């Protein structure tokens, strides 16, 4: 961001960066040198990367009651005060830490504002609150656009990419907006749909970092920035791959024998590879709807009478057992006091995630599945259960107003962080796959994250819209936050094999997590050969050199890819083109 003429601000920044530069974890190929500006420049054979500390914001605004923003008074270069609180900026690692105290009242939002300008040719990309919904894209300047957690501004004419973000696991829900005169970071401290009441404690709200690169491609730039944002990811020891029965069963008409059949198919298409894949039992192994809640003490008595025995059978077949759970809601409610207030739209009732007894229930449910022998636990629906909205509808509001958790001292981000820590504790050394989870809060707790909304075994258009988009636009997070799961490469009689086959090929070669979803009874010899080739590639980490979308600046479903140094064109469209209807 532009230099500020104030000597005190410049001194503050220089000191901040001097303290933070040594803590960076960077590729060995780079060497660091100090420029007179105070930025650190990382030189390699092909890139110039500057990790520059931001200037303090020119203005700070606070909303305590949820009634509107009011400008805070600048007490010093790094301290801003309101009637009931204090916002302080301090050096923290490679960036600037934002700390907030509000001992005597409520706290809703804080907005940090910088005066900035960007090249008129710039295209902007932000992240999403949870999964992508086919809506991730580089876009022209749109002042009201909510860009959660981080954003990039890329100038195609110069090849320069400027990126700003907050480090993973912040204590506030954070998003950015950019307009013609400035850049704003919005920090949401609410509890449920109303203000939090943090009391006499300091909230370490976020750490802000920035990076500028040239002439790296936008993907390479964002990939390096994501590694800077997440210094302590939970890294699996090998690529995570397997199969999942959801897109041919959809939670109905399957049993333990069907899962043994799935396990046998997976063992066959991965035979000979040392990295053993996971066979995941998706929703439907307990009574209830297609997305049931707890209790999670046993399987459906008729269809899944012995869950530990099924896990043992899968291991004997030669695969690793995995299982699905919705840990944050109940189908059978033993005590209404367990439930949170606020929006609840399903028969499954959401738990209040601030109650200790509910966190203990969640921990024990996850631990029980590990004790049964399941090595990968796919947990689902927690963001929807927490806020009553899907990611595409969260926007700046996140949830409906006028409700709160039982413990109002916590921010929503802190509530979710505690949930993820509880899931991690229950899973022990097992693999956690988060679905409908908040990636920026999950990094460091989960090995793998579902990055987009569901693909489909019913309509190819859904796979085209969701799967390809999320693979391309969440690829920078792969290996930086966790392993990326772009969702299943599915195939049924309702979807065209030639298009499904291409998606299968792209996932396998990209190095992201490949999960296939197909009924083994329907697979032809040609298809089985394709599944085996893809699975063996994916288990080995994808194509050498990885995959990069080449046309993603101009489309939401990239067709042109560089894979292993070779340019590949995929054909995603059906005969009539893309379907413009809701899927």
What does each model-found stretch correspond to?
Residues 96, 227-228, 264-266, 306-310, ...:
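Short alpha-helical segments and helix-capping/turn motifs at coil-helix boundaries
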Residues 40-277, 376:
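Carbohydrate-recognition beta-sandwich/jelly-roll modules
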